[in-house]
Amino acid sequence: MAYFRLYAVLLAVASSVAAVKVNPLPAPRHISWGHSGPKPLSDVSLRTERDTDDSILTNAWNRAWETIVSLEWVPAGIEAPIPEFDEFPTSTPSASAAATRSKRANVPIQFVDVDVEDWDADLQHGVDESYTLDAKAGSDAIDITAKTVWGALHAFTTLQQLVISDGNGGLILEQPVHIKDAPLYPYRGLMVDTGRNFISVRKLHEQLDGMALSKLNVLHWHLDDTQSWPVHIDAYPEMTKDAYSARETYSHDDLRNVVAYARARGIRVIPEIDMPAHSASGWQQVDPDIVACANSWWSNDNWPLHTAVQPNPGQLDIINPKTYEVVQDVYEELSSIFTDDWFHVGGDEIQPNCYNFSTYVTEWFQEDPSRTYNDLMQHWVDKAVPIFRSVSDSRRLVMWEDVVLNTEHADDVPTDIVMQSWNNGLENINKLTERGYDVIVSSADFMYLDCGRGGYVTNDDRYNEQTNPDPDTPSFNYGGIGGSWCGPYKTWQRIYNYDFTLNLTNAQAKHVIGATAPLWSEQVDDVNISNLFWPRAAALAELVWSGNRDAKGNKRTTLFTQRILNFREYLLANGVMAATVVPKYCLQHPHACDLNYDQTVLH
């Protein structure tokens, strides 16, 4: 009986995909294939009802078509049943059907006809990204309809994965196809950190290329941190004295370049200046008095005295009035460069001991002994948030959840500020949505892409352990996290299987606007950034675009396997240096590397 149930599941899968080799990622919300046979493509031209010369749409189509032609893509990972079963039924038609196919195949696709309803919709949060794509039997055109240009761009990236080589120097769509598609969540992002280590503009472009192909639409750019300040500020050019070198800086032109490159691919860039914690470099060059504890020992070895969770310490002085003058100047200058309505202003990991080094803060506490660190955080919110809102009526702020949920928190944080949740998984998502905050999910236990690679702090005596102290219990060097605070490593399966709205009410679930996978860069630079983002970020991309469940509500992780393995090869073909995730044997032998023989084990 178990054998029959498993075979039935696989047969259902086989019947849905047997006709085609392609397996686009993220999987469209709805896709249906015809049966009349391959549709050849000639030199396909873009047609619209509007003059689109030099527009985002025209340029996007030109890139897509150039990619299609130059790659002559052949899918590398094809879905098939677990090896013990017979091969999938072939899509070979009867003789009469073959004759019909041959006749229809004589009409090559020559055009992509795009109908956009709202050409002027800006690339901001909540913009409509839906599209339909139709390639009908006997038609010489692919029809794309979209509410906005941004939806049409997604149609192009889907089409790129559908058109493949015919093996004889030509290009084909394997069958007529109809797609109706739209994202589950409006916010689908990656976070890059250029404060711990510098990332070149070239490598930022590479990440944006991968994001566009997988329909991720937000680059959260954590610009700086205590370790370095790489961003040129006209108002305070001395801030880049705390860049790692003159070469490792971003000019205004560099910032605009990244914003423009992203926008051309339907991706928003949301900058983050992390404040008031994680703030030494740059700020201290303007005035050392606006930074507390910058010259203290971070004191992990004597934790009760610690001033930071990692080297080096430094937090903006919340009580010093000049702090807010400098913050306003820096914030307004960067707001003029980054065009998105949203801006991330940090708010995480305040360390109370740091303010023992501030005369301003210690005197403030002495003035009123009833004051607490919660009052200090509220002072920051009350003084800083009006500055952050002042640049635009459409400005919306994002903060890390600590400002609300940390031991040291502000008691009154406006609920129109978006909270990015990184700690305690479902528990914190529940707390935030219950209070009415919109939430970006970045749970470290599922989505932190830097985790599980050991520690980086040096002179660490914990590694000096020659024998296993307790073979029955995992420890630091024996089966434990080995210095990575958020270990283990987050595999694509860990990311894809995250049900981050689990147990939320419908009202709470509506407050979850999407997710971002952060890659903190303590151990990341140009050499390995793409390997650490990709292809794992593609698991997040499908999770927030079309979900991890099928129409019956069952987890579809086993069906996603070949899709992500194939997509890794597609990323490489497009110049995105994605990491190896399996022996190539697994790619070429679908499900032969599964842990569980039962393909329904995740349902």
Swiss-Prot record:
Catalysed conversion reaction: Hydrolysis of terminal non-reducing N-acetyl-D-hexosamine residues in N-acetyl-beta-D-hexosaminides
GO MF term set: beta-N-acetylglucosaminidase activity; beta-N-acetylhexosaminidase activity; hexosaminidase activity
GO BP term (any one): polysaccharide catabolic process
Residues at the site labelled Essential for chitooligosaccharide substrate binding: W485
Upregulation: Significantly up-regulated expression with colloidal chitin and chito-oligomers, namely N-acetyl-D-glucosamine (GlcNAc), N,N'-diacetylchitobiose (GlcNAc)2 and N,N',N''-triacetylchitotriose (GlcNAc)3. Expression is unaffected by the oxidative-stress-generating agents tested including menadione, hydrogen peroxide and diamide.
Predominant location: secreted
Superkingdom, natural source: Eukaryota
E.C. number: 3.2.1.52
Null mutant phenotype: Normal growth rate, cellular morphology and efficiency of conidial formation when grown on easily metabolizable carbon sources YG (complex) or MM-glucose (complete) media. Grows poorly on a medium with chitobiose as a sole carbon source. Low level of beta-N-acetylglucosaminidase activity.
GO cellular component: extracellular region; membrane
Keyword vocabulary terms for this entry: Carbohydrate metabolism, Disulfide bond, Glycoprotein, Glycosidase, Hydrolase, Polysaccharide degradation, Secreted, Signal
Active site: D225 (charge relay system), H278 (charge relay system), E349 (charge relay system)
UniProt cross-references to CDD domains, sorted A to Z: GH20_HexA_HexB-like
Keyword Disulfide bond appears in the UniProt entry: yes
Residues annotated as signal peptide: 1-19
Record-stated family: Belongs to the glycosyl hydrolase 20 family.
Job of this protein: Part of the binary chitinolytic system. Involved in hydrolysis of chitobiose and higher chito-oligomers (produced from cell wall chitin by endochitinases), thus contributing to the formation of germ tubes, fruit-bodies and septa during hyphenation. Hydrolyzes synthetic substrates p-nitrophenyl-beta-N-acetyl-glucosamine (pNP-beta-GlcNAc), p-nitrophenyl-beta-N-acetyl-galactosamine (pNP-beta-GalNAc) and 5-bromo-4-chloro-3-indoyl-beta-D-N-glucosaminide (X-GlcNAc).
The protein, known as: Beta-hexosaminidase
Name of encoding gene: nagA
